């Protein structure tokens, strides 16, 4: 079987690795670097990728950076006289990685394992897979970045039982995952994150500060000058990296712009203390996902054996200090934060080819999945942090008599109401035979594959007719929406609960009206008009309350109707029981006549009841 390469497709940098024997090895690019900038530029129709593209970013406006942040969206970028999708630009980076991996291996590479942030949604995962396909790669598996890192860290520790926390702060995204390692099984217990937090944000804080300082001194706003802004970005990134090793750095940008008196230069120094002050709020934002992941995993800090740092941004001293303070543990530095994800992806490639034995990877889905049900409620079928691959089915029914079709509205999120979650897709199951509401049995099945990609099937159990949808990338969530979804879920918990209670009450009222009308019809001419009239009066009162929309009135009238309907049902039951008893007495008398000598026997009859 041909080699399966492991690719870490990052926001700012990417890396490629391959399994050689039992060891994962990073493949250096043609310039001798072990990571490659995720930058694409165009010059005279030529596509330039990596270090060369990054070097000319200042002078070449046809340069595209951080394309990963647009994956899963319909947003396009303009360059080279045309518009490109994020998948196409990502494919150019993947092609470059694939090309130099082939040069190193001396053979054609057709398969890859590609990593994504743990908090990437269905659309973003599908977009990543599509980018691989465009690049000529068969994507064997999409693996979460923290999980891949744990795989690289834990491969030689499969005989130990450990719980590890992976803190992954990359160029554009932040993830925390809790894993349990033991007997070769890598089991993801929980994952949390912030898809709008990464090294780019730290750079931006420095850029904003430099722009502000220059404006104070010279009265010129550099943020409106594209070329100056790119130079500031490069300088901010370099200063950030310098401050991981020194306590102060010099920023020198000659001829940054021109004023009335001639050229102007930017000369300043940035201390680590000032950098920490500028980025304090970003470091604070890393704490909530750590606590969330621990809570979801049902673990306390004392139960965590190791803390692994992943991503270049974890080299920032303030970030390391925050991790120590939050976890009470010294982070494990045995893995290279820039390379460990690609190495883990290559190991997963080895698991697929059979070169790595006795290793099982159990990943999770980051957000709940479900459908919209009556009243706009979001009914979850698969909860977040469920181990994948997984499949879950639930039977639903129609909401109206003789309903010929049902709309299946597929959603992803954590809010109780469908409108507050993100639509993944919609489809229809048609040709349902005419039947009263509640009779047709519609089975909805959610299936998440090993890559976290969702397909949904609806099946009429009566006719066996079914309809399936595989969620396409243009219908997925954006990073911001996922982040907002989780925050909104916490902030709006009380309001959500109230709205759900209202919908539940309305559904209950609707059901009570339907069943009572049916009972009144069934009891016509059966001799208990008093109870029927009382139930009808209570039913009319409830219908009026339903029309008014007054929830308190609906609740009171519903209780009254339930009481009257129960009395009517009891009469019906008593009548049926009396008829049955009379019939049994008749049969008993006949039996006694035919065999008067038999005096024994029991009055208790054993019966089987089938629950429907």
UniProtKB/Swiss-Prot annotation:
UniProt region (Disordered), positions on chain: 576-612
KW Iron-sulfur (keyword) present: no
Transmembrane segments: none
Amino acid composition bias (Low complexity), ranges on this chain: 576-594
Signal peptide range: none
A single MF term (Gene Ontology): unfolded protein binding
Coiled coil residues, start to end: none
Keywords in alphabetical order: ATP-binding, Chaperone, Nucleotide-binding, Phosphoprotein, Stress response
Entry annotated with the keyword Transcription regulation: no
Record field: compositional bias (Acidic residues): 603-612
Induction behaviour: By heat shock.
Phosphothreonine sites (modified residues): 173
Gene3D superfamilies cross-referenced by the UniProt entry: 1.20.1270.10, 3.30.420.40, Actin, Chain A, domain 4 (3.90.640.10), Substrate Binding Domain Of DNAk, Chain A, domain 1 (2.60.34.10)
SUPFAM superfamilies linked to this entry: Actin-like ATPase domain (SSF53067), Heat shock protein 70kD (HSP70), C-terminal subdomain (SSF100934), Heat shock protein 70kD (HSP70), peptide-binding domain (SSF100920)
Function summary: Acts as a chaperone.
Family: Belongs to the heat shock protein 70 family.
Protein's name in the database: Chaperone protein DnaK
Gene name, Swiss-Prot/TrEMBL: dnaK
């Amino acid at each position: 079987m041909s080699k399966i390469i492991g690719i870490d497709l990052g926001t700012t940098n990417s890396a490629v690795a391959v399994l050689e024997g039992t060891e994962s090895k990073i493949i250096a690019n043609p310039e001798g670097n072990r990571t490659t900038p995720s930058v694409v530029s165009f010059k005279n129709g030529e596509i330039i990728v990596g270090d060369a593209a990054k070097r000319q970013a200042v002078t070449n406006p046809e340069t595209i950076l951080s394309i990963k942040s647009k994956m899963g969206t319909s947003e396009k970028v303009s360059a080279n006289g045309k518009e490109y999708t994020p998948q196409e630009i990502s494919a150019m980076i993947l092609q470059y990685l694939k090309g130099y991996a082939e040069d190193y291996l001396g053979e054609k590479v057709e398969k890859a394992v590609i990593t994504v942030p743990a908090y990437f949604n269905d659309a973003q995962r599908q977009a990543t897979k599509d980018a691989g396909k465009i690049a000529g790669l068969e994507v064997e598996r999409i693996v979460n970045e923290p999980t891949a890192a744990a795989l690289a860290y834990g491969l030689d520790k499969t005989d130990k039982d450990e719980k590890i926390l992976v803190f992954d702060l990359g160029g554009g995204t932040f993830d925390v995952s809790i894993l349990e390692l033991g007997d070769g099984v890598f089991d993801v217990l929980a994952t949390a994150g912030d898809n709008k937090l990464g090294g780019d944000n730290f750079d931006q804080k420095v850029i904003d500060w430099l722009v502000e300082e220059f404006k104070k001194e010279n009265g010129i706003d550099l943020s409106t000058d594209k070329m100056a802004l790119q130079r500031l970005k490069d300088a901010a990134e370099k200063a950030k990296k310098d401050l991981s090793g020194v306590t102060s750095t010099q920023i020198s940008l000659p001829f940054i712009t021109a004023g009335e008196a001639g050229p102007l230069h930017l000369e300043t120094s940035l201390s680590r203390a000032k950098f920490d002050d500028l980025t304090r709020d970003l470091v604070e934002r890393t704490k909530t996902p750590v606590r969330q992941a621990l809570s979801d995993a049902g673990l306390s800090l004392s139960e965590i054996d190791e803390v692994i740092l992943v991503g270049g941004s974890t080299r920032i001293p303030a970030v390391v200090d925050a991790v120590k303070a939050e976890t009470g543990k010294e982070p494990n530095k045995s893995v290279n934060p820039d390379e460990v994800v690609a190495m883990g992806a290559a190991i997963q490639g080895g698991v697929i080819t059979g070169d790595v034995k006795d290793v099982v990877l159990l990943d999770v889905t980051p957000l709940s999945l479900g459908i919209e049900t009556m009243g706009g409620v979001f009914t979850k079928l698969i909860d977040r942090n469920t181990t994948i691959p997984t499949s879950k089915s639930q039977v639903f029914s129609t909401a109206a008599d003789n309903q010929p079709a049902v709309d299946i509205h597929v959603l992803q999120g954590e809010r109780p109401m469908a409108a507050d979650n993100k639509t993944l897709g919609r489809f229809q199951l048609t040709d349902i035979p005419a039947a009263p509401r509640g009779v047709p049995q519609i089975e909805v099945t959610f299936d998440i594959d090993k890559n976290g990609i969702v397909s949904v099937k609806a099946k009429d159990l009566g006719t066996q007719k079914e309809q399936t949808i595989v969620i396409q990338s243009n219908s997925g969530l954006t990073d911001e929406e996922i982040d907002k979804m989780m925050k909104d879920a916490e902030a709006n918990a009380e309001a959500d609960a109230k709205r759900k209670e209202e919908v539940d009450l309305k559904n209950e009222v609707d059901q009570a009206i339907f069943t009572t009308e049916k009972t009144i019809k069934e009891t016509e001419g059966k001799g208990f008009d008093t109870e029927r009239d009382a139930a009808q009066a209570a039913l009319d009162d409830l219908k009026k309350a339903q029309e008014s929309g007054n929830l308190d009135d609906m609740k009171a009238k519903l209780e009254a109707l339930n009481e009257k309907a129960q009395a009517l049902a009891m009469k019906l039951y008593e009548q049926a029981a009396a008829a049955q008893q009379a019939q049994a007495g008749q049969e008993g008398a006949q039996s006694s006549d035919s065999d008067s000598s038999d005096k024994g026997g029991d009055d208790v009859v054993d019966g089987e009841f089938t629950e429907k």
